[in-house]
């Protein structure tokens, strides 16, 4: 377990070393850069990449990929694709970039090396405020990520895999929390408390009245607002993580007051958050650069119609100028990210969304959030 809990600053070194090793392997196995297909995905990376105009210039702000951890200690899903093979598929589909998402490590270092390997693509990284950065939200980890060479670490996710809300609400997270309880008390990372000092979720499923953010969360938000990344001089981005609607709204309110430039409301319709349309509308209405994220899980061929309807309603509640579509895939047996986004484009068209609206959610808004030039 100690190996799994290796320091936040050490694991990324392994990741970037693996990236160079993977680059060598990719070169040795030819232009396709694949070895038969994704593990258990049911189709091969060598299959043609999706050809959809909505993907030309698209940026995925939430792309899971290897190298990442998988094992009995943390329980997150194995990954179906590594950063190099994902780049090749995304590039073939005409995509412009993606953010390398991991719950447990910062990915600024991996983004730096991927940019050196493939300078024709926009790679960005981020970090999750989970136990690998400490038992509390850790402002120092944010500074560390921002000062990694290149400055390509941009998104700071509040607690996700280790959040207090998810550990109470979602069954597989509760199992995960039971593992963590062997090492940490409490076995989750909190973002809020009652004004009286008690636990925000002492009476789950109801939060306490008059809750407030923890001091370290407020400090982290201030850092996100005021810190520029090394070399590239970019702004940091707050993503709300897998926290409750009440906690998300508190964080967004505090972030707007602190001057955070861009805010992502992390997948508000997944079980790990579970917002209402009214709460989504309230969240994005707090400022001009707040964006609700809608992941591709509503776009699969076996998704129930009522789920699609729920997502369409959520997107309309946010408004396309305050919404982004992300894949959030990369798990074993899930669609590859470009394929998932192409599915979403089809579902959205079927439900009355125009090409301009698709461009807003897949190209224009992600570029705004990352502070890069708008698509031509």
Label the predicted regions.
Residues 69-74, 108-110, 248-254, 274-280, ...:
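Histidine/acidic-residue-rich catalytic or RNA/ligand-binding cores of hydrolases
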Residues 84-107, 120-131, 153-163, 236-239, ...:
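Divalent metal-dependent hydrolysis catalytic cores, especially in the metallo-beta-lactamase
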Residues 11-23:
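Bacterial N-terminal signal peptides
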Residues 30-121:
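An N-terminally biased module of ancient metal coordination in phosphate/nucleic-acid-related enzymes
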Residues 234-306, 324:
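Catalytic pocket-lining loop regions of alpha/beta-barrel enzymes
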Residues 134-266:
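Extended substrate/RNA-proximal surfaces in nucleic-acid metabolism proteins
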Residues 338-376:
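Mid-to-C-terminal alpha-helical segments outside catalytic/metal-binding sites
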């Amino acid at each position: 377990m100690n190996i799994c809990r290796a320091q936040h600053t050490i694991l990324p070194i392994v990741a970037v070393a693996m990236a160079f090793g993977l680059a060598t392997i990719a070169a040795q196995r030819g232009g396709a850069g694949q070895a038969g297909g994704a593990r258990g995905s049911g189709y091969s990376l060598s299959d043609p990449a999706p050809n959809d105009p909505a993907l030309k210039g698209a940026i995925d702000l939430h792309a899971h990929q290897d190298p990442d951890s998988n094992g009995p200690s943390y329980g997150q899903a194995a990954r179906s694709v590594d950063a190099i093979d994902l780049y090749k598929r995304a590039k073939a589909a005409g995509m412009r970039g993606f953010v390398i998402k991991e719950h447990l490590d910062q990915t600024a270092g991996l983004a730096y090396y991927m940019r050196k390997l493939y300078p024709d693509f926009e790679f960005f990284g981020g970090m999750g405020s989970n136990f690998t950065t400490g038992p509390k939200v850790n402002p120092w980890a944010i500074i560390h990520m921002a000062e990694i060479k290149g400055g390509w670490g941009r998104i700071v996710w509040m607690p996700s895999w280790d959040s207090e809300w998810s550990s109470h609400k979602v069954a597989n997270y509760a199992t995960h929390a039971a593992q963590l309880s062997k090492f940490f008390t409490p076995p989750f990372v909190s973002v809020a408390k009652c004004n009286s000092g008690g636990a925000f979720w002492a009476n789950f499923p109801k939060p306490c009245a008059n809750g407030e953010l923890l001091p370290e969360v407020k400090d982290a938000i201030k850092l996100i607002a005021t810190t520029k990344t090394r070399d590239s001089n970019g702004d940091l981005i707050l993503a709300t993580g897998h926290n409750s609607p009440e906690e998300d709204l508190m964080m967004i309110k505090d972030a707007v007051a602190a001057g955070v430039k861009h805010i992502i409301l992390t997948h508000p319709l997944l079980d790990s958050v579970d917002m209402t349309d009214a709460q989504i509308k309230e969240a994005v209405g707090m400022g001009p650069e707040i964006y609700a994220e809608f992941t591709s899980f509503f776009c699969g061929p076996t998704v129930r119609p009522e789920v699609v309807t729920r997502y369409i309603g959520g997107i309309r509640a946010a408004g396309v100028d305050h919404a982004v579509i992300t894949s959030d895939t990369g798990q074993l047996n899930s669609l590859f990210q470009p394929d998932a986004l192409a599915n979403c484009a089809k579902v959205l068209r079927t439900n009355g969304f125009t090409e301009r609206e698709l461009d807003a959610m897949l190209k224009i808004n992600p570029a705004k959030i990352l502070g890069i030039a708008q698509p031509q």
